[in-house]
UniProtKB/Swiss-Prot annotation:
Database matches in Pfam families: AP_endonuc_2 (PF01261)
Protein name (database record): Probable endonuclease 4
Required co-factors: Zn(2+)
Task performed by this protein: Endonuclease IV plays a role in DNA repair. It cleaves phosphodiester bonds at apurinic or apyrimidinic (AP) sites, generating a 3'-hydroxyl group and a 5'-terminal sugar phosphate.
InterPro entries in the record: AP_endonuc_2 (IPR001719), AP_endonuc_F2_Zn_BS (IPR018246), Xyl_isomerase-like_sf (IPR036237), Xyl_isomerase-like_TIM-brl (IPR013022)
Swiss-Prot/TrEMBL keywords: DNA damage, DNA repair, Endonuclease, Hydrolase, Metal-binding, Nuclease, Zinc
Positions of Zn(2+) 3 binding: H181, D228, H230
Gene3D superfamilies: Divalent-metal-dependent TIM barrel enzymes (3.20.20.150)
Protein family according to the UniProt entry: Belongs to the AP endonuclease 2 family.
EC number: 3.1.21.2
Reactions mediated catalytically: Endonucleolytic cleavage to 5'-phosphooligonucleotide end-products
Any Gene Ontology biological process: base-excision repair
């Protein structure tokens, strides 16, 4: 069975997320642990956490298919010490929110070096992760590949490997692969040999067992455009046929697919249906 869902709103409470996930045809989800555009974050109350866990059990959502995503302001690669420290402090709180809710994974973008260079940025990210991980417990940080634009670190998977090499608690770091970001950075998943090359690179750098989530997004721009614009499934330059190639790999099927496509719950329900239609149309075998 395919594990699929979307980034879900928390405006009506954490406890609404499991049911809303089922309602859009999903069995997996990602959420922000707080207002993503704020440096402020607070732990959920005991009652909120209990309700959330009860709804998870009621709707039979596997904890391996539940993810949090860090806030937009976090930048562990920042050369500005105040921003770096605020990012570290916020990530610590986000980890604690995950722990209280029972969510095992916190996804982050590595960050932007803001012109100071990749090596310095990678060192700052690793220093920040060590500060976070050495002062928290349990939750696994997922490093996401990003688009090749600005001073972003992580547009090559090798960047993520260099970060992990500098992290003390390597067992608490894994990766997320974003299909739009990868396509935007030159990883062509529309061809069999492109997917084979990608999976081989992941295996050689990290081991495929470290791939915990796929952000399933089409791309509004062509291969290698470095624009970072997500598109609805099948409506972008990856397209139905391209996703059919990607979906056909068993290594891809074993990982939860989380939509971050434009729109809200209604559009995400349509995109989940579109994924099913692609699987059926191209007669893709699913375990």
């Amino acid at each position: 069975m395919i594990k699929i869902g979307a980034h879900m709103p928390i405006s009506k409470g954490f406890d609404r997320v499991p049911k809303d996930t089922i309602d859009i045809g999903g069995n997996s989800f990602q959420i922000f642990p707080h207002n993503a555009r704020s440096w402020q974050a607070k732990l959920p109350t005991d009652e909120m956490a209990t309700k959330f866990k009860r709804e998870m059990k009621k709707h039979r959502i596997d904890w391996e298919n539940a993810f949090c995503h860090c806030g937009y302001l976090v930048n562990l690669a920042s050369p500005k010490e105040d921003i770096w420290q605020k990012s570290v402090d916020l990530l610590k709180t986000e980890v604690e929110i995950c722990r209280k809710l029972g969510i095992k994974y916190l996804n982050i973008h590595p960050g932007s070096h803001l012109g100071t260079g990749e090596e310095e940025g990678i060192n700052r990210i690793a220093r920040g992760l060590n500060e976070v991980l050495n002062n928290t417990e349990d939750v696994i940080i997922l490093l996401e590949n990003v688009s090749q634009k600005g001073g972003n670190i992580g547009y090559r998977l090798e960047h993520l490997k260099r970060i992990i090499d500098l992290v003390d608690q390597k067992d608490r770091v894994a990766i997320t692969y974003d299909t739009c970001h990868g396509f935007d950075s030159g990883y062509d998943i529309t061809k069999k040999e492109g997917v084979e090359s990608l999976l081989s690179e992941i295996e050689n750098l990290f081991g495929l067992e470290r791939l915990k989530m796929i952000h399933l997004n089409d791309s509004k721009y062509p291969l290698g455009a470095a624009k970072d614009r997500h598109e609805r499934i099948g409506s972008g330059f990856i397209g139905e046929a391209g996703f059919a190639v990607f979906f056909s790999f068993k290594e891809v099927q074993r990982v939860p697919w989380i939509l971050e496509t434009p729109g809200g719950n209604e559009e995400h329900a349509e995109d989940i249906k579109k994924v099913s239609e692609i699987i059926e149309k191209y007669r893709i075998e699913v375990d």
